[in-house]
């Protein structure tokens, strides 16, 4: 087969061109995303009930939903959180379960649970988590003229954003929807003239009745007139402020208009939440990308639209923040840059080792064609370009060059021994094809168990496994197809291989001269090598225990989310003022910030729900160091000025965090009452104080308390003074501007018409207030009694019922010690019990699973090697080197301060598949030489000399191909850093072991049988 190829160079060239054309066409159509598009096994149920407290939401709504939803199949965990005005149920399912069936089942169970609710309650909103839930970016719209920013202009800007900006954004084909928050809405406030009403013997209820009666709609009525039928319409509706003012009513025998008895004015509704960007009140829009849209196209269209907005609306300021496309571009560009640098380093290595200019040119031809063929396979197998698949390409690049080096080196050796060039090209390629195929299979075998990892991690790294497999197969095809043909064409006019005179002077090939002497030294002092082997066996377990276990490596970021719960009943204006006060402390450190205070209006769950006393501040700094400094100093400033506040910081959300739930706290202690009842505030406060005393080095936040005023009526006095409960409720609603008469439709929203007498202070709500009855005016303070209570602001519950979640930010051995201390203190109190969850446990489960993957991978390698060598002994010789290699990897991780995480473990697994390739070639060569009659020791020395240059070259090219990932700075490089560190340290140790330890082990085993 290979002989026919060398004689048909034009046919081979045409095949290459066809592959490149198809591959380039496939690249243009491949989707580009940050991570692979996979299903996320999460469903959220959002409950809304504006008039209910957190306790009522939990007891009356979430408890019934929870009892139904815990029965859903494949449920992994359920967390219910109740707060004033609503609640959220987050369900996580086993990966691989039928998401469509589960979604239908959840809807049916929600309908079953809500059948007993009050008819006025809204049906809960159910949403499936998706990779597109993370906005591509946020757009802040604010007024440029801050000095003349008034309530009217802000209302106009809000209406303009809702009516115009969002619709123009949603018209883009790449945009699925625009989620918006920070909107301001108007209302009509009717302030009755109570003196006039009392003078004519009426109250404010007469005004509300008149307005409701004036807003009449007959509905669908028609009347017949001869042969025709006409619709009947009744023109009596209230749609403007003037309509309300001109409503007629009859009181005390006279007719009045509303404007005669009350003042009607249009004003802004009471703020429940607010957003400011760099000190300006703004409207924020989250742009959600369609799942099949390309990020680059979306960014280009948005940039064009932003330029048009700034030109058409000069009074408005448009700002793009939290740009996921920037993260994608930066990560992808760095990955591509690292890929190119890796290829360049590989060519430099070949340039110096092969000592001429033509051999690197062969590799330069092979690498691009193999990469383009790989992208063609990507397109066929529906694999996107993302940081995972690109990292697989980079891993495969080093091994891709290995095949080319081995083929070129073997052809050159046979040619130098006197074989004709064509025969050297044909038989040199044919000789190494079988061991190269075995190397590809062993490497692919390493990745097969990664595909079967449970959960999202297995699905995510399917792309990496497939990318490496595709790259290796493509490289093998191109190596045997291209190199013999073009090698023959490049050198056919030369009698033999002649190194370039200039390069041979600076060649590193002279380093091989001392190989025989070093190997002979190890043969004489075999105890040194066996001592290293024994020490590695003993110390692997010690290093494994000492290394911290994490799910993911620490990813650098230049932005953050600062979460604050003030733990005080402050108004939204004070909340915003405090946020601005914090940001004023960092004038030169922060590039931009967006403060979201109070409740937000987003429909999707990309931004967590917040209450009136909570704030989320997004901060973008110039560098990783600046953001670390900001987080540290901001926390200190908040602690000094507002000691009751609870605060935390986290990286700004991206799809990678969403997939791996990296925001999960290290340890969460779920403290609950032994009898299942609600924890008493005083008991919980005392318990947390004891924990702070016992764990001074651990930050234990204050409980988030919700203080409220409780009004208790006196039924006996209500009956005595002939006052109904509805009268008291109506008065309180009017006093707090909460008595809604009707809602006027304004298209996509409705404007409430409210009757009120102006908001009152809490101290004036009862004292000095009266209710008019038929018997006269009754002081409200003799009918009501006021008390103040407190309860948890957020009430958490799960499968085991209600609990208090205590977050402990501790890692490693400190986590185990902290849990022992907490358990001892909590269980000493007969009222409480505790259980634990958090990333501390999930990380260890994942590491155990990866260790199982490593064992399975080594077993697969053993089976493949045993089949290849037809021996049960030689696989042990090759695989024994993994002991020293794994010890070297763990030692380097420990010295560099890295943890044992998903990426470092995958690097270790991949290293096991790559590092034995050199040993496979060496053992195969030793076997061939022994079959030709060489003695054992001579065969070992000869095989070492023949393969030394190829082994060093392949190791160096693999190491240098992934060396660019040792430079951190973006998410892609940070993610690949521990993988690269593990792979490089393993390859360095593996090269030493392949060159010196494997020949020694081969000699020790076969010296007795050698004749």
Where are these regions (language model features)?
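Solvent-exposed, membrane-proximal periplasmic/extracellular interface segments of envelope transport
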Residues: 56-133, 195-216, 237, 574-663, ...
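Beta-strand-rich non-transmembrane domains
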Residues: 79-84, 158-283, 287-288, 675, ...
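Interfacial segments of transmembrane alpha-helices in multi-pass membrane proteins
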Residues: 2-9, 291, 296, 329-386, ...
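Transmembrane helices with small-residue packing motifs
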Residues: 10, 17-53, 111-120, 379, ...
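Cytosolic juxtamembrane regions of multi-pass inner-membrane proteins
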Residues: 312, 328, 332-336, 353-355, ...
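Signature of alpha-helical transmembrane segments and their immediate interfacial
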Residues: 1-32, 432, 500-553, 669, ...
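C-terminal transmembrane helical bundles of large multi-pass transporters
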Residues: 324, 641-1009
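Juxtamembrane "pre-transmembrane" interface segments
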Residues: 179-183, 191, 260-263, 274-348, ...
